[in-house]
Amino acid sequence: MPEVVINGPEGRLEGRYHHSKQENAPVALLLHPHPQHGGTMNNKVVYTLYHAFVRRGFSALRFNFRGVGRSQGIFDRGEGELSDAASALDWLQTYNPNATACWVAGFSFGAWIGMQLLMRRPEIDSFIAVAPPANMFDFGFLAPCPASGLVILGDQDQLVTADAVQRLVTKLMNQRDIRISHRIIPGADHFFQNHLEPLSQAVEQYIAGNQRKRAAVAGR
């Protein structure tokens, strides 16, 4: 799990990268929760997502947004963090020019940034949004949502409301050719304390199902 340095809009961005041994492996970018509330690339949920992708054969990158850890810059209320994510995706694609698929996955604030990146980068094939804070941030930019994905929430989440997430999922599911899987993890709070294993299982099941569908289409 080598440390990497990415040239970001405001200076260096600190990251951790796993390069798959598989030729032309798919890639995944992982985005951490709110920088001003202790969010880092080493967050347990982000770490869990990262290793779920690694186990499914992906080349995966997680990094610290500006002002977090050894990443340069200061918090920019989402706008700068979106630019950071775009730079990280550029880096990931530079080292994986023949990747068979491109995913973005984020937790909480990171899910909000990831969905915005999804709108700007048509090469992103799918997404995973864990506890997307639909009751705190505006997700109205998803009009229309350009890719299918997975939304996960714990039923004991104390920060993100189930009603707000359900409205977001319903909005996305009403769009043509977009398929949204919505998973509820029983007993899990916002940080999935003592529930990281069922989170990992849900993510890996979704990724595996997506990979099977892609393989079936390619084999026709």
Label each PLM-derived region with a short phrase:
Residues 196-220:
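Catalytic active-site module of serine/aspartate enzymes centered on a nucleophile-bearing elbow/loop
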Residues 145, 151-153, 157:
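Short beta-strand/loop motif that positions the catalytic acidic residue
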Residues 73, 188-200:
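Catalytic histidine-centered segment of alpha/beta-hydrolase-like enzymes
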Residues 172-191:
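Catalytic histidine neighborhood in serine/cysteine hydrolases
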Residues 6-96:
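Serine-hydrolase catalytic machinery in alpha/beta-hydrolase-like enzymes
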Residues 161-171:
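Short alpha-helix in the alpha/beta-hydrolase fold that links the catalytic acid
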Residues 155-160, 190-191:
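Acidic catalytic loop of the alpha/beta-hydrolase fold
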Residues 85-147:
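Primarily recognizes the serine-hydrolase "nucleophile elbow" in alpha/beta-hydrolase
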